[in-house]
Curated annotation (Swiss-Prot):
GO terms for biological process: cytoplasmic translation; translation. It comes from Homo sapiens. InterPro entries: Ribosomal_uS14, Ribosomal_uS14_CS, RIbosomal_uS14_euk_arc, Ribosomal_uS14_sf. Component of the small ribosomal subunit. The ribosome is a large ribonucleoprotein complex responsible for the synthesis of proteins in the cell. This is Small ribosomal subunit protein uS14.
Length: 56
């Protein structure tokens, strides 16, 4: 079995490796609440466009 056959061959159906940001495909700092599926950096960038407002 060569490297090409083994690389990323394990099924990723659940867990952190199965989910990624819909904008930048990052896997860290993911916000899944309300079905956002965005990393926190992209959420900060697009929050106003989505309709989130910052409360004091």
């Amino acid at each position: 079995m060569g490297h090409q056959q083994l690389y990323w061959s394990h099924p990723r159906k659940f867990g952190q490796g199965s989910r990624s940001c819909r904008v930048c495909s990052n896997r860290h700092g993911l916000i899944r609440k309300y079905g956002l599926n965005m990393c926190r950096q992209c959420f900060r960038q697009y929050a106003k466009d989505i309709g989130f407002i910052k409360l004091d």
